[in-house]
Design a protein with these regions (language model features):
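Active-site microenvironments that recognize anionic phosphate/pyrophosphate groups
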Residues: 1-219, 223-227, 302, 317, ...
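Helical scaffold of the NTase/Pol beta-like nucleotidyltransferase catalytic core
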Residues: 190-192, 222-249
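Catalytic or ion-translocation cores adjacent to nucleophile or general acid/base/metal-coordination motifs
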Residues: 232, 241-264, 270-324, 328-331
Length: 498
């Protein structure tokens, strides 16, 4: 008989999650989770963590401890991993020791640790489909996200019946650390965070379990407070890249449609990745009165980006505040920019901070979330003809040139390819009918063969993503759009003092 509990304990020892003196204690703790009163047998050798957890979870399903939905399985195997995960203070102490050697060593250790405790599920990340699309703005990173599990209908129904308790208030709250979860809220027994002091207040750093890019981390306010963009935001972002000079750190905008999926809890995102927008070239320089020491570049990008660069973080904060405050109230009807409707604001920015050697850099992406009858989801949002590929909000990650596309596209693109190659009626197939007009356009443009069909579809998806970003641009890359951007810059320079 194989003893997978012993195998899990051995995994914890091998990855330094527990010590030898803890092994008997942890073994008995896992016995309790499994509702067993004794173990036995030998531990299988060479089994990956995924296989060990699957074996234990399968056994729990067979014995009726849990249901067989992916939600219940995830809740259960996270509980198992929680028995191996060190206490928060131990993780913090280890991070401090590693950080003292170098910031890079600190974040490398912490990221690997989060994978070792299965908070970052490495096996699921490997499922993501990724490719590069070469655009006029530079390479764009395209991914079909398969690592975030889709809700099982049974779990959705059960969650709807369950009593809502409002704890934690959201999935970003610090109270998630160690939380057992429920059908409508993920288990977090293996979540660990590192405290960070920003502007005299506690924040926490953790890694995203879905890791859309290399070392995708989240900085969250200890207090459950709404997203906000202002002077304090810029100061915090630049403080974080002072602490972690090898990281970028950015914030989603603070308004619906142009913000991220969670506006109720102030947080930032960062990581190692050098995004396409970072690599994009500067196509022009501009100047702001009173800031001769701050270089301001206009980035060649589908969306309007002002890149502020200076040796002084404080000077960047001062200029970023001026630009943002003017933009908040800026109107240009010729360009379709209306700052508010009945007192509801529309203008905001998406800021991204990084280091440029010893200098600081802050990108400000101008955003507007106005809606109309023609564009009820947003004037500066992917337009309806692109929704078959991307309908969701264009947040920080997409703005920087990483397309996070829905899982449905994996199956839909495969079905569409087969329909194109076989000459089937695409409109007659409900699963791909939304792609029909696009497919007609592609078939006029390309000669599809079994050898080239996959690559054609991938590259054309990349082209759609660029159009998505262009739709989200408040100032278009046209002569009229460039003139409108210059009018805004001129309006900022009219502010003599601030």
């Amino acid at each position: 008989m194989k003893d997978y509990i012993k195998a899990l304990v051995n995994y914890g020892l091998e990855h330094e999650l527990i010590q030898q003196a803890d092994s008997r204690y942890v073994y008995n703790r896992i016995l309790d989770v499994m509702r067993l009163d004794r173990g036995g047998g030998t531990a299988p050798k060479g089994e990956p963590l995924t296989a060990i957890l699957t074996a234990l979870t399968d056994d729990a399903v067979r014995r009726g401890l849990i249901g067989d939905s992916i939600t219940e399985r995830d809740l259960f195997d996270t509980r198992l991993m929680g028995e191996l995960t060190p206490f928060p203070h131990e993780v913090h102490d280890r991070f401090v020791r590693e950080y003292a050697v170098s910031p890079e060593r600190g974040t490398d250790w912490f990221y690997n640790f989060c994978g070792d405790v299965n908070y970052i599920r490495r096996d699921r990340l490997a499922r993501d489909i990724r490719w590069v699309y070469k655009s006029e703005y530079g390479p764009m990173n395209i991914t079909i996200n398969l690592s975030k599990p889709e809700k099982d209908p049974r779990a959705i129904a059960a969650a709807r019946r369950a009593r809502q308790n409002g704890y934690p208030k959201c999935q970003l709250c610090a109270e998630n650390e160690g939380y057992a979860g429920r059908l409508d809220h993920p288990a977090r027994q293996n979540l660990r965070m590192v405290p960070v002091l920003l502007d005299g207040k506690f924040w926490y750093m953790q890694f995203s379990p879905y890791s859309y890019y290399d070392q995708h981390c989240i900085f969250l306010n200890q207090k459950h407070t709404p997203m906000y963009i202002g002077r304090e935001t810029f100061d915090k972002l630049l403080s974080l890249v002072t602490m972690l000079p090898h990281y970028f750190v950015g914030s989603n905008a603070d308004l619906p449609i142009v913000g991220g999926s969670i506006l109720s809890h102030e947080h930032f995102q960062g990581g190692l990745d050098v995004f396409p927008m970072t690599k994009a070239r500067i196509e022009g320089m501009t100047f702001f009165d009173g800031f001769p020491d701050v270089k301001v570049g206009i980035v060649k990008w589908p969306m309007p980006v002002l890149r502020l660069n200076c040796a002084s973080a404080d000077r960047i904060v001062d200029l970023a505040e001026r630009i943002t405050c003017v933009w908040r109230d800026y109107n240009d009807e010729a360009a379709g920019i209306i700052s508010e409707t009945d007192g509801v604001p529309h203008n905001t920015v998406t800021p991204i901070a990084r280091r440029d050697g010893v200098r600081y850099e802050l990108d400000l992406v101008l955003r507007n979330n106005r809606t109309t009858e023609e564009y009820p989801l947003g004037v500066f949002h992917p337009h309806p003809e692109l929704h078959h590929i991307k309908k969701e909000n264009i947040g920080l990650i997409e703005v920087m040139g990483l397309a996070v596309l829905p899982p449905r596209l994996k199956t839909e693109l495969e079905t569409l390819k087969n329909a194109i190659l076989s000459g089937s009626d695409i409109r007659a197939d409900a699963s791909i009918a939304a792609h029909a007009d696009w497919a007609d356009e592609l078939m006029r443009k390309h000669e599809f063969t079994p050898e080239n069909a996959d690559e054609i579809l991938r590259q054309e998806v990349g082209a759609v993503f660029v159009r998505v970003l262009e739709d989200a641009a408040v100032f278009k890359r046209t002569p009229d759009g460039r003139a409108a951007l210059q009018r805004f810059i001129t309006s900022v320079n009219r502010i003599v003092s601030f």
